[in-house]
Amino acid sequence: MASDFLPVRRALLSVSDKTGLIDLARALVARNVELLSTGGTAKAIREAGLPVKDVAELTGFPEMMDGRVKTLHPLVHGGLLGRAGIDEAVMAEHGIAPIDLLVLNLYPFESVTVKTDCTLADAVENIDIGGPAMLRSAAKNFARVAVATDPAQYADLLAELEANNGQLSAAKRFALSVAAFNRVAQYDAAISNYLSAVADSAETVPTRNPFPAQINSNFVKVMDLRYGENPHQSGAFYRDLYPVPGTLATFQQLQGKELSYNNLADADAAWECVRQFDAPACVIVKHANPCGVAVGAGCGDAYELAYATDPTSAFGSILAFNKTLDAATAKAILDRQFVEVLIAPDYDAGALDYATKKANVRVLKIPHGNGLNNYDTKRIGSGLLMQSADNRGMSLGELSVVTQRAPSEAELGDLLFAWRVAKYVKSNAIVYAKDSRTIGVGAGQMSRVVSAKIAALKAEEAKLTVVGSVMASDAFFPFRDGIDAAASAGIQAVIQPGGSMRDGEVIAAADEHGIAMVFTGVRHFRH
């Protein structure tokens, strides 16, 4: 056996999550590993009929202070920190026996404090002290000691012991050490973030400041990327430790080439836009901007309508659907155009089978979920901008009619549709829509009136008529020229935030043209 393999003869098990505990303990006992344990863990092992020695018996000190002190003892930490070939004499002198394996997971601080009714006292009692101390001791001494922090690690740990006659490799011990230090860092960050957000420690259930004096973030790498935004930039994708269900980070790639930085940025824009619709919808995104969006009777209908908005820009785009993608729609897409990424909550067997004919197309499955990100962040030079996420919806009852003519029922439906799309278009954003489909999109211009003209131009290029359509603007019109441009194109109704110093002039312009206009009181800048 290679010298970097070391036997496991003595293990200390102390876990709050009992998942897989008994199977692990039974496998270790079968290899004649002596088990040490504490409190509820020892009780569970003993009730399973397995031999275990209490840490209190080892140290000669009982668990005290309601369990706050039980493993903070030289006989425990010396057993974890003792170095092979260096500390044997000292350990023998003080009666310290080596511990070769530590299996420990921490008090559930994160899951306790995520509850809105969590009291400060509950939070404090779930701050583990002895656990992180032992993890650090064992992880520091990876040259001799192995440490497991998660039930998901048990199977690989036992497999290596089985394959190597009860021994673990240096590579395995080091990998487990890194995972342990990461876990301690995550745990301490969660405690720091929670306590930093407590606005008043005198409150039983403290109010939490959404923007505390200090924040600590932890992300897990999902994959390396081919490159960053440009080929001369390197890149990788990381996800939150606890990703929100239904968001992009929960995707499963079913086929296709490796994802790029731009693929993921565009995919996020497409997915977030499409998941706000209840009826079958398709969103086509290019360079983080929707170039076609539609709601239809099914995926195929929605795709045809969305594609018709801007067939030229749809080349090399990202397509997102909010319903299971069927074979007929998959065939229609892949036979017609080059696609970078397909996204849907699921695919029928025929759709996946047909997609294999275009092996390079990246096919992503994102399970349904109603969760929303609470915050957005953006890096700037040596700093971080942080804000609450723009999750503001809009209902008919919130709209204020400000013109002489009120929108018709059909126009109101189209106005809300266009408003939802405009939220995901780069500012200055103008969206023309009719019958729950986009007719033209003007994005990212420094002048709002220019965005309006571009939306009309895109409609003309696609041979779609703007006459009778509605217009959504992500921010107010500073002058009447945007309304005049809309009227020239044939727009019949407008939705916008309002709030300009010249709202009166803008409203008067709409009345002159017989345009119905509603204010939302909400702006949707997107940069």
UniProtKB/Swiss-Prot annotation:
Keyword entries, A-Z: Hydrolase, Multifunctional enzyme, Purine biosynthesis, Transferase
Residue ranges of domain MGS-like in the record: 1-149
Pathway recorded for this protein: Purine metabolism; IMP biosynthesis via de novo pathway; 5-formamido-1-(5-phospho-D-ribosyl)imidazole-4-carboxamide from 5-amino-1-(5-phospho-D-ribosyl)imidazole-4-carboxamide (10-formyl THF route): step 1/1; Purine metabolism; IMP biosynthesis via de novo pathway; IMP from 5-formamido-1-(5-phospho-D-ribosyl)imidazole-4-carboxamide: step 1/1
GO biological process, one term: 'de novo' IMP biosynthetic process
GO molecular function per UniProt: IMP cyclohydrolase activity; phosphoribosylaminoimidazolecarboxamide formyltransferase activity
One Pfam family it belongs to: MGS
Alphabetized Gene3D superfamilies for the sequence: 3.40.140.20, Methylglyoxal synthase-like domain
Documented EC number(s): 2.1.2.3, 3.5.4.10
Catalytic reactions on record: (6R)-10-formyltetrahydrofolate + 5-amino-1-(5-phospho-beta-D-ribosyl)imidazole-4-carboxamide = 5-formamido-1-(5-phospho-D-ribosyl)imidazole-4-carboxamide + (6S)-5,6,7,8-tetrahydrofolate; IMP + H2O = 5-formamido-1-(5-phospho-D-ribosyl)imidazole-4-carboxamide
Recorded GO CC terms: cytosol
SMART domains linked: AICARFT_IMPCHas, MGS
Domain free text: The IMP cyclohydrolase activity resides in the N-terminal region.
NCBIfam families: PRK00881.1, purH
Family: Belongs to the PurH family.
Name of this chain's protein: Bifunctional purine biosynthesis protein PurH
